[in-house]
UniProtKB/Swiss-Prot annotation:
The keyword Ion transport applies. One of its GO terms (cellular component) is proton-transporting ATP synthase complex. ATP binds at residues 234-241. GO terms for biological process: proton motive force-driven plasma membrane ATP synthesis. This is V-type ATP synthase alpha chain. Produces ATP from ADP in the presence of a proton gradient across the membrane. The V-type alpha chain is a catalytic subunit. Pfam families: ATP-synt_ab (PF00006), ATP-synt_ab_N (PF02874), ATP-synt_ab_Xtn (PF16886), ATP-synt_VA_C (PF22919). HAMAP family: ATP_synth_A_arch (MF_00309). It catalyses: ATP + H2O + 4 H(+)(in) = ADP + phosphate + 5 H(+)(out).
Length: 590
């Protein structure tokens, strides 16, 4: 804190300061008389360029810049889950108590509550040898999440001091470890970690399990592997945020980190209002007991958007290291890219495509490459981070740089379609433009845990949808009536798949979440109906008789009429379909 520079230039969030000898790259600094938080992004001799994470209005040359000696870091410890932070990990509820509805410039608050006492259960004893990532104590952070206090990476040695089980604050020392050089290191309930440095892991593992979302279009047609990466691009009003909310509510991850990056404040308010009322499907507890929110809304300083993405992924890595499966939702990475473009412009850097900086692809890669399914340091634990980034291309144009560069680093592409959203088809995922490269990796798990037919049924349904798209070109020109009955049957069954299976109601208590078993049975029913109807059409029974409106309507409504826990009703429906078509065949035989 003894080093001090002097501001010589202010341009929005970009500040230049002189007399910065001894400062380091990416160091966290306090800028101006109000001590605004900033980060050094360029050093040239004694001159430093600083990215300021708060409004610089009324700042002037001559004001001081104070050193901290450490990079931009987050505090990792109990108290993160269930909390809401801004982009630089300041807890918004604490700021609201101090300054009211608006964040006062230069306000300093601790990310974690220093006064709250946590019940600590120590897991090591004197004389034990510990290694990086080993769990030394456990804290019940919420009724769902047990917080594991770990030996920091790069520290190993012998335990020389241990406190008894009891209640402790995050600042109190729990365990003291003597390293091989004879130095003592105190382990507290919290540790700091630089946001731009990925946390180390033991080993990266191949992705074998799906991240189940309860959304049929994703789980069945375009599944995401646990530890995988996905992008949700879509124009304005296509349903990106609603889809992200659904994924945050119902996905099978243990921890959800939701980063609202440059989007509207009302969207974060929706999350705050809804999540406490919702039950986690696997535990029955409140959703907020497994969720971390990072809110960096559109009216907050632009520079902090970049920090919010890194803050979120660092918190996700911390819980991954404990052995949890974490899902991080970033809404939206386009706003982060726009922040990079704005700051790059103020730095007078050479622009690349559409004004974005030339390093946009490498920044996106840095972010998405921090996902993965890993074996953690220390004990034999496995954890994962699944990254789902929304992309907001202007005018829904998927050829723009952010969407195109994101496609290079993700293996799951869920393209949202404005025309589907306008037709009230949600989730508005275009099944012809979307893809998942995880299907082959996950096929073993799906066959073993759901049914051997899963992939076969999915591929049959996809072929029908593709064939229906080709037929629609003819229908638009000459109408449906001129098509032969076998092609009209394809149109009818594709309609069943689209309305009865792919369309899902986020506000329905029955339909908002579908178990894999229910999804399998729904698709099986539709394909069973197609397989029973096709031979009848081949034998010249007219489509008007084959298409029984009552039966087709029942198939469409099965998503609402048959709850997750009552799968026997599918067998009854299948029996009725078989009975109808057998009777129809017999009548025509006579």
């Amino acid at each position: 804190m003894d080093k001090k520079g002097e501001i010589v230039f202010v341009n929005g969030p970009v500040v230049k300061a002189d007399k910065m000898n001894g400062f380091i790259m990416n160091e966290l600094v306090y800028v101006g008389k109000e001590r605004l938080i900033g980060e050094i992004i360029e050093l040239e001799g004694d001159l430093a360029t600083i990215q300021v994470y708060e409004e610089t209005t009324e700042m002037q040359p001559g004001e001081p810049v104070f050193s901290t000696g450490s990079p931009l870091s987050v505090e990792l410890g109990p108290g993160i889950i269930g909390n809401i932070f801004d982009g630089i990990q300041r807890p918004l509820p604490v700021i609201a108590e101090k300054t009211g509805s608006f964040i006062k410039r230069g306000i300093e608050v601790n990310p974690l509550d220093r006064d709250r006492e946590w019940t600590v259960s120590v897991k090591v004893k004197l004389g034990d040898r510990v290694k990086p990532g080993q769990v030394v104590a456990e804290v019940p952070e919420t009724s769902i999440v047990t917080h594991r206090v770990m030996v920091p990476p790069h520290l190993s040695g012998e335990v020389v001091e241990v406190v008894p089980n009891g209640k402790y604050t995050v600042d109190q020392e729990i365990v003291t470890v003597k390293d091989d050089k004879g130095n003592n290191h105190q382990i507290r309930l919290h540790q700091k970690w630089p946001v731009r440095r990925p946390r180390p892991c033991g080993e990266r593992l191949p992705i074998k399990k799906p991240l189940l979302t309860g959304q049929r279009v994703f789980d069945t047609f375009f599944p995401l592997g646990m530890g995988g990466t996905a992008a949700i691009p879509g124009g304005f009003g296509a349903g990106k945020t609603m889809t992200q909310h659904q994924l945050a509510k119902w996905s099978s991850a243990d921890i959800i980190v939701y980063v609202g990056c440059g989007e509207r404040g009302n969207e974060m308010t929706d999350v705050l209002e809804e999540f406490p009322k919702l039950e986690d499907p696997s535990t029955g507890k409140s959703m907020m007991e497994r969720t971390v929110l990072i809110a960096n809304t559109s009216n907050m300083p632009v520079a902090a958007r970049e920090a919010s993405i890194y803050t979120g992924i660092t918190i996700a890595e911390f819980y991954r290291d404990m052995g949890y499966n974490v899902a991080l939702m970033a809404d939206s990475t386009s706003r982060w890219a726009e922040a990079l473009r704005e700051i790059s412009g103020r730095l007078e850097e050479m622009p690349a495509e559409e004004g974005f900086p030339a390093y946009l692809p490498s920044r996106l890669a840095e972010f998405y490459e921090r996902a993965g399914y890993v074996k953690t340091l220390g004990q034999d634990r496995e954890g994962s981070i699944s990254l789902i980034g929304a992309v907001s291309p202007p005018g829904g144009d998927f050829s723009e740089p952010v969407t195109q560069n994101t496609k290079r680093y993700v293996r799951c592409f869920w393209a949202l379609d404005k025309s589907l959203a306008s037709a009230r088809h949600f989730p508005a995922v275009n099944w012809l433009e979307s893809y998942s490269e995880y299907l082959e990796d996950l096929s073993g798990w799906l066959k073993e845990n759901i049914n051997e037919d899963w992939i076969k049924l999915r591929n049959m349904a996809m072929e029908l949808l593709k064939e229906e798209d080709r037929l629609q070109e003819i229908v638009k020109l000459v109408g449906e009536d001129v098509l032969p009955d076998n092609q009209r049957l394809i149109l009818e069954v594709a309609r069943l798949i689209k309305i009865g299976f792919l369309q899902q109601n986020a506000f329905s208590k029955v339909d908002r979440f579908a178990t894999p078993e229910k999804q399998y049975w729904m698709l099986k029913i539709i394909m069973f109906l197609y397989e029973k109807a096709r031979p009848l059409i081949k034998n010249n029974i007219p489509i008007s008789r084959v298409k029984n409106n009552e039966l087709f309507s029942e198939v469409i409504k099965m998503k609402e009429n048959i709850p997750n826990g009552d799968l026997d009703k599918f067998k009854d429906l299948m029996a009725r379909i078989e009975e109808y078509y057998n009777r129809l065949w017999e009548n025509y035989q006579e």
